[in-house]
């Protein structure tokens, strides 16, 4: 059902990649679209070998990942997971942006990341930003504004973007009476 509805698997481990494959999701890019993307801040040898073998786009959360991929598979499709310098979540544990977060390439290093993409002959597919889980619309609007500025930086570096992602983080009501997600409002922010 999820595959038929166009859901993309954002895997964060080799095990999740294998589960997605076992569930019928197809690796690689198809008409510019991927069923599976791998997101991390580092690559171990086994995961690196598997994403290269299957041509799974990698959402790179560190500069080292760009060098690792470029060394073994020039042309590999990548996303850049950018830390915009701010984060928000329903608790400190779910805040994945800002100076205290380990996640993502710091927004001020985007030009250097673009240079690494070019020097490693990688193919930039998109920009990704995830500031936390349990995010409200005010903070998501901040993400949208930050993303537009980052797109301008990438364009100024002569790289093409095919997609942008504000990540997840939408608050989900767990109990009756909690606010529901207004998807139309969320999309209107863009």
Task: Describe each PLM feature range.
Residues 166:
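Structured binding elements
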Residues 1-163, 172:
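Active-site-proximal beta-alpha core segment in soluble small-molecule metabolic enzymes
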Residues 171-190:
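Anionic-ligand-binding alpha/beta catalytic cores of soluble enzymes and soluble regulatory domains
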């Amino acid at each position: 059902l999820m595959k038929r509805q166009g859901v993309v698997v954002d895997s964060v481990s080799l095990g999740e990649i294998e589960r997605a494959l076992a569930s019928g999701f197809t690796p690689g890019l198809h008409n510019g679209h991927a069923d599976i993307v791998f997101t991390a801040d580092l690559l171990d040898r086994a995961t690196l070998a598997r994403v290269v073998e299957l041509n799974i786009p990698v959402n790179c959360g560190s500069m080292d990942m760009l060098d690792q991929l470029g060394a073994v598979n020039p042309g590999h499709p990548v996303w850049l997971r950018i830390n915009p310098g701010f984060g928000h979540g329903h608790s400190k544990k779910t805040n994945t942006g800002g100076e205290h977060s380990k996640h993502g390439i710091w927004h001020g290093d985007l030009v250097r990341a673009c240079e690494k993409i070019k020097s490693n002959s990688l193919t930039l597919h998109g920009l990704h930003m995830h500031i936390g889980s349990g995010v409200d619309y005010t903070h998501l609007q901040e993400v949208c504004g930050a993303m537009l500025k980052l797109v301008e930086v990438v364009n100024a570096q002569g790289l093409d973007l095919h997609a942008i992602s504000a990540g997840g983080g939408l608050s989900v009501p767990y109990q009756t009476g909690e606010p529901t997600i207004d998807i139309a409002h969320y999309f209107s922010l863009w």
